[in-house]
Structures are given as structure tokens and as C-alpha cells.
Amino acid sequence: MATYKVTLINEEEGINAILEVADDQTILDAGEEAGLDLPSSCRAGSCSTCAGKLVSGAAPNQDDQAFLDDDQLAAGWVMTCVAYPTGDCTIMTHQESEVL
């Protein structure tokens, strides 16, 4: 099992946290375990509540998501509830209004 540094940021929400996330743990779960107040609803990758935006680093594996289309995935949108890290990365949280 590999572990990666996942940085979650959102200036408006006061979030700037560096997490150690195992490759078998979702980014949302890791953030919640660290005490962050992150948005979520379905926890299955089929809504937009947990949407984030990849700012830098390795794109997470989110094969289980059903909301984003190929163009949105290519643009760096992330469903944190089903996103597993594949390398160090930085993700801006609370982006539901931007992805819609």
C-alpha cells in the first residue's frame, strides 16, 4: 500500500491541509478523518456535492464516479468521495457550483 501527500485547499472555507492518504482510501474519507468539514452527499460519485478541482500533481483514480464526463475529467474535476490518490496532488475543495 502506497501513501501520498494530498493537499486540500479552499481559501473561502479556511482549508489548507496536507494529508497522508493511502491509495486504498478516498480523499473525502481522509479529509473527514482529519477533521475537515467537506461537502458530501451520495458518497458514490453520482452527484456533484463533493466536487473538487485538481490544482497540481497526479490525477486521482476515480473509476467509480458516474457524474463527470470525459472533458470534465480531462479538465481536472474530481469527485472526492470516490477519488483514490495515485501520487502527490493538490485539490481545491467545495467546487460544486463551478462544475455545474
Swiss-Prot record:
Keywords annotated in UniProt: 2Fe-2S, Electron transport, Iron, Iron-sulfur, Metal-binding, Transport
Domain of life: Bacteria
Ranges where the 2Fe-2S ferredoxin-type domain occurs: 4-97
Binding of [2Fe-2S] cluster, residues: 42, 47, 50, 81
GO MF, any single term: 2 iron, 2 sulfur cluster binding
Cofactor: [2Fe-2S] cluster
GO annotation terms (biological process): electron transport chain
Listed InterPro entries: 2Fe-2S_ferredoxin-like_sf, 2Fe-2S_ferredoxin-type, 2Fe2S_fd_BS, Beta-grasp_dom_sf, Fd_pln
Cysteines paired by S-S bonds: none
Cofactor details (free text): Binds 1 [2Fe-2S] cluster.
KW Nucleotide-binding (keyword) present: no
NCBIfam families associated with the record: fdx_plant (TIGR02008)
Summary of the function given for this chain in its UniProt record: Ferredoxins are iron-sulfur proteins that transfer electrons in a wide variety of metabolic reactions.
Protein family (similarity comment): Belongs to the 2Fe2S plant-type ferredoxin family.
Protein name per the record: Ferredoxin-2
Source organism (scientific name): Aphanothece sacrum
